[in-house]
């Protein structure tokens, strides 16, 4: 039995994690949950899973949440906490051995660090933690003897493929050390909502268009990131930190079927790939169950049903966010945190219909350019949080100016 904490339990990753727990009740027990604002769903989750402690990020909802829990009438009700510090306490909850981090965006960084400092195993679905603060997170993992297991499909695929390399049992998969025999990583991308659109048609994109993914069921923010290909660009930075691979050896390839979740190329030129249906529960389960494989009743893989697998090179003009991510990763230091924060704010403003879809990379690029002269190559956690806040404010101020900028390559 594994005892788990789910951070962001009412979001897409959190709800899918709890579906897995319901399907495998003899393998997992939920001991702690955290959510942002959805107290009704959190109350329902408490009724089903009966955790020891829960936390809501919005302290203004704490009284209502406590009333909801009292009205459940369950024996041994959970401790109910509120606020950011409460989320951190839940992340480090003593009886949990594995923490699933499903909080969207950089908001998941501090809770993840709390879990690492408590020496928990981390099932990381919050890629922003490594993107913004990989240079801080990786040493913290080593220092606290905490293991980080990727819970997103691409990095889970790489993680699984690496176990086919020589001496894999001795490889430090997730602390930035290049596994023996690994030459390159090929990250697959669906191409997002606009993979079949002409570049000139992107000026007409609506929020509804951008939040409809052809293959995956995901939250709104990450679905927009998929449409801009920023999601894949961020995953390049994440792969660099997880597996120690140089940026020039990490390639993005469009794979519309989303069946091959990523590939690794070895020093002898052979390639290993991990295949499966496009279902986020697969990588989440593996991060939770590793090093074991638990039997499920999920749909079995069928190559003849798929019919064909196709690949193509991504269009750099169509997907400028991809190049911005590579550039920020190569700059290192605080630049990835600035990129991530600017993207989060730009996407938020797009979802609120304050800017157009094509302005997302424009404002990200402007923010990164403004940070070049302030780049810190050896940041601590406080430095990262400071530039994260700066970048968000900068994007908002630039949008308020109402100016249009041309992306500078």
UniProtKB/Swiss-Prot annotation:
Q: What is this enzyme's class at the first EC digit?
A: oxidoreductase
Annotated residues for binding of NADPH: 10-13, 36-38, 126, 128, 219
Name the InterPro entries for this protein: DXP_reductoisomerase (IPR003821), DXP_reductoisomerase_C (IPR013644), DXP_reductoisomerase_N (IPR013512), DXPR_C (IPR026877), DXPR_C_sf (IPR036169), NAD(P)-bd_dom_sf (IPR036291)
This enzyme's EC code(s):
1.1.1.267
Cofactor or coenzyme needed = Mg(2+); Mn(2+)
In which pathway does this enzyme or protein participate?
A: Isoprenoid biosynthesis; isopentenyl diphosphate biosynthesis via DXP pathway; isopentenyl diphosphate from 1-deoxy-D-xylulose 5-phosphate: step 1/6
Highest taxon listed in the record's lineage = Bacteria
Keyword entries, A-Z: Isoprene biosynthesis, Manganese, Metal-binding, NADP, Oxidoreductase
| Reactions this protein catalyses | 2-C-methyl-D-erythritol 4-phosphate + NADP(+) = 1-deoxy-D-xylulose 5-phosphate + NADPH + H(+)
Q: Can you name one GO molecular function term for this protein? A: NADPH binding
Positions annotated to bind Mn(2+): 152, 154, 235
- Residues holding 1-deoxy-D-xylulose 5-phosphate: 127, 153-154, 190, 213, 226, 231-232, 235
Family per similarity comment: Belongs to the DXR family.
Q: What's this protein's function?
A: Catalyzes the NADPH-dependent rearrangement and reduction of 1-deoxy-D-xylulose-5-phosphate (DXP) to 2-C-methyl-D-erythritol 4-phosphate (MEP).
Q: What is this protein called?
A: 1-deoxy-D-xylulose 5-phosphate reductoisomerase
Kindly list the organism's lineage: Bacteria, Bacillati, Cyanobacteriota, Cyanophyceae, Synechococcales
């Amino acid at each position: 039995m594994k005892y788990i904490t789910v951070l962001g339990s009412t979001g897409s990753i959190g709800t899918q994690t709890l579906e897995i727990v319901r399907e495998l009740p003899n393998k997992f027990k939920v001991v702690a949950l955290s959510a942002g604002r959805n107290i009704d769903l959190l109350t329902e989750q408490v009724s089903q899973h009966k955790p020891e402690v829960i936390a809501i990020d919005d302290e203004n909802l704490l009284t209502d949440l406590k009333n909801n829990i009292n009205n459940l009438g369950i024996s041994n009700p959970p401790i109910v906490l509120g606020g950011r510090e409460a989320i951190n306490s839940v992340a480090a909850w003593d009886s949990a051995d594995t923490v699933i981090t499903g909080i969207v965006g950089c908001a998941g960084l501090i809770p993840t660090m709390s879990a690492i400092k408590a020496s928990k195993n981390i099932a990381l679905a919050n890629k922003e933690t490594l993107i913004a603060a990989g240079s801080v997170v990786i040493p913290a993992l080593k220092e606290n003897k905490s293991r980080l297991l990727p819970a997103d499909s691409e990095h889970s695929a790489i993680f699984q493929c690496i176990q086919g390399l020589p001496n894999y049992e001795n490889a430090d998969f997730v602390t930035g050390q290049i596994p023996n025999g690994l030459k390159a990583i090929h990250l697959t991308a669906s191409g997002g909502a606009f993979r079949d659109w002409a570049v000139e048609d992107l000026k007409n994109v609506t929020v509804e268009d951008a939040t409809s993914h052809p293959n995956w069921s995901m939250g709104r923010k990450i679905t927009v990131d998929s449409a801009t290909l920023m999601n894949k660009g961020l995953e390049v930075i994440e792969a660099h930190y997880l597996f120690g691979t140089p940026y020039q050896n990490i390639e993005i390839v469009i794979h519309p079927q989303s069946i091959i979740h990523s590939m690794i190329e070895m020093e002898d030129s052979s390639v290993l790939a991990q295949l499966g249906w496009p279902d986020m529960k697969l990588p989440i389960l593996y991060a939770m169950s590793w090093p074991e494989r638990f039997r499920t009743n999920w749909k079995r893989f069928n190559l003849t049903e798929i019919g064909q697998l196709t690949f193509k090179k991504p269009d750099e003009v169509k997907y400028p966010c991809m190049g911005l991510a590579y550039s920020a990763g190569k700059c290192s230091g605080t630049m990835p945190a600035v990129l991530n924060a600017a993207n989060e704010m730009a996407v938020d403003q797009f979802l609120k219909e304050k800017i157009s879809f094509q302005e997302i990379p424009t404002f990200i690029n402007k923010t990164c350019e403004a940070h070049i002269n302030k780049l810190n190559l050896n940041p601590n956690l406080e430095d990262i949080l400071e530039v994260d806040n700066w970048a968000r404010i900068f994007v908002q101020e630039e949008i308020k100016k109402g100016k249009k900028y041309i992306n500078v390559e």
